[in-house]
Amino acid sequence: EWKYKKEVPPRLGLIIDDTLGTPLMAKPSAGLLNLCIKHRHIGKGLGISIYMCVQSYCSQGGINRAIRENTTLLLLFKINQEAQIKKVMEESDLPLSDERFHEMCKYCHDKPFNFLAMDFAPKDESKRFRSGWDEYIS
């Protein structure tokens, strides 16, 4: 018997860290792409949240494009390679200019250990972008 007043199903989460260049990322037979696409339907609809910690947005043996395009929330820490930033802008199809995106990145990354959070499915459009966890920006 459930010991709490309100019945809440368990929440499942999978953290994938430091796997660039490994068979998990490089081989389709490893099943990562399939898991990421079908994650909402696992466990009879219970689903699983997948958190991927990577040091490169797109690279050889890195995150598959289909996974990148199905991302719900992207935390973008400082990137020094302009090609990577451009790739994020291209694939994200953000509702803002490249110039504004660069301004937002600079604003967020000027603070130590901070990130630009991009929510690709916000319930409120004004909450699409954040500096860190606490500050909404537009």
Feature roles, as predicted:
Residues 1-99, 103:
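Conserved P-loop NTPase motor cores
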Residues 104-108:
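Short proline/glycine-enriched turn/loop segments at secondary-structure junctions
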Residues 111-138:
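Conserved P-loop NTPase motor module
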